[in-house]
């Protein structure tokens, strides 16, 4: 009875996968890229020098003119804060002869319609 004891190994998904060859394909665990730290230091020095050059350019382009008061819209053309009475607007449309059914296009015959009913209307 004691002869069949086997030690269990840890969880190995590659060994337990139904298609063990597919384990290497697709998304896998991310690995940390190894980089030389000396190269990173050089890059940071270069980027700091570029930032200082960019700051000098901003000061040269700071020649904006002030805003002219002629471009400011004044008067009653704005609708912010204005109360709109939608019932009165609907009543004025009815008074003008505009009904809700006027915009329906039941009698429209399109260019691609080849029904017999549409041919009779022509």
UniProtKB/Swiss-Prot annotation:
Ranges for region Disordered: 1-122
Comp. bias (Acidic residues): 39-63, 97-122
GO cellular component term of the entry, any: nucleus
Coiled-coil features, chain-numbered ranges: none
UniProt cross-references to SMART domains, sorted A to Z: CHZ (SM01082)
Quaternary organization: Forms a heterotrimer with H2A.Z-H2B, stabilizing the association of the histone dimer. Also, with a lower affinity, forms a heterotrimer with H2A-H2B.
Protein name (record): Histone H2A.Z-specific chaperone chz1
């Amino acid at each position: 009875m004691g002869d069949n004891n086997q030690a269990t190994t840890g969880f190995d998904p590659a060994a337990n996968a139904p298609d063990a060859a597919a384990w290497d394909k697709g998304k896998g665990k991310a690995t940390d890229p190894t980089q030389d730290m000396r190269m990173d230091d050089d890059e940071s020095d270069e980027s700091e020098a570029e930032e200082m050059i960019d700051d000098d350019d901003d000061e040269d382009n700071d020649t904006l003119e002030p805003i002219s008061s002629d471009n400011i819209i004044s008067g009653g053309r704005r609708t912010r804060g204005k109360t709109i009475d939608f019932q009165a607007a609907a009543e004025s449309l009815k008074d003008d002869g505009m009904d809700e059914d006027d915009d329906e296009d039941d009698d429209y015959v399109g260019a691609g319609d080849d029904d017999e009913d549409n041919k009779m209307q022509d």
